[in-house]
Amino acid sequence: MYKDKNFYLNLFQVSEAQLERLAADGLKGGGSYCDLFFENTSYNDLLLRDGIVSSGGFHIDYGVGIRVLKGDKTGYAYSESTDSRSMAEAALAASKIAEGGTGTASAICCRTVTAPKDRYSYEYDWRSSDATRLVPWLEKLKEKIAAKDSRIVKIIVSFSGQVSDILMFNSLGELTFETRPMGILSASVVFSQDGKIESKNTSRAYRAGTEMLTESLLDEIADSIEAGIDDCFVAKRPKGGQMPVVMGAGASGILLHEAMGHAFEADFNRKGQSVFSEKMGQKICDESISIVDDGTIPFNRGSINFDDEGVPGQKTYMVKDGILTSYLHDRISAGFYGVSPTGNGRRESFRYAPIPRMRATYMESGKADKESIIASVKKGIYVDQFSNGEVQIGEGDFTFFVKSGFLIENGRLTQPVKDINIIGNGPQALADIVAVGNDLKIDEGAWTCGKGQSCPVSCGIPTVLINKLTVGGE
């Protein structure tokens, strides 16, 4: 659904001349760069508990954030109003926070920068869908899940939709604008068998409008809930220790994101807080490994047309054939390193300044097949679903709780396992990968990354074999 420049200017009640003046005023204190981020986001959500709508809501977040850079100093201020006085006060505050002295406003000429490709075009946005249109979809999903298994005792299905109108302008004269949709459909189910309780959760999230709601999506979610339930009831806690671990394709990518991906973000490297700070151009893992952070996958939760600094989204190789080739940059870190920004300057909302953040992070497929990887392991663990975990971002030390997996014995998956965690160091685990599968899967769940502020992300990985990790068991 294309909207032209005038739609955004009218929405935020600003003119190009005002944008030019605000950016120039932000530099009066001696700053070198100023940008403005306007946002109008509508949120709506519904929750169906055991067939009854138990909660729902709608709200709007509206405002502008203004940032001024001067050397290593950053000034940031925001306003929930876009009237001339409020914006002028925010620009002045940002300039003062950046420790400006005295200066003069420079002439800035506005020019529009268009996205090379719209990665999430949509026909109908969530603002046009009230509860009377959405509830039937939730009811239908609940019915499909209920029909899957007689052991189901509780079903919760929920929907969350948002639409963000974004306008950005900076002191380079670059004007960018777009509308970002997001839809999330989730299910949480409780099963009971012989007095034993187990649960499963799943979600699907896309940068899409109401057209994402289809019968096939409902079937996919219901099938996902059903899969592996029998294994849950017979799973046991195995003996722990250091052993080979096979990571299943798809959701195991969260380990790649958390334990390894953050170490590639340029702010940590610029400050010397990452183990990769001095390793650019060096071999850090097997040559079969290439790791990508990608903002260009159509309709993907982590994709962007522009990042939150107005830089077009792109596909960035952090690791290519085992060599560290790039960090993930915002404008600040790109200036420090003397490179181009990679489109990773992201923020939670207009209330936050952008920082380097991941988008869709994944490892590219290798040449091995899943079966041969498992067959190569005499004794180990196969894991494919995780819940919570902890990571020391700089060093990469991690602990992840395994939601589901299997023992590997003599090259075969045998006993289902549960109540275990895997413990290791991300960069070391990366170096210990000895096989990469040919089955890359990008997980479509509602992943959200927290780094002082929340951002929607995606992750993926093919089947990989890590030579040794510590498994916490009995």
State where each predicted segment sits.
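N-terminal small-residue-enriched
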Residues: 1-474
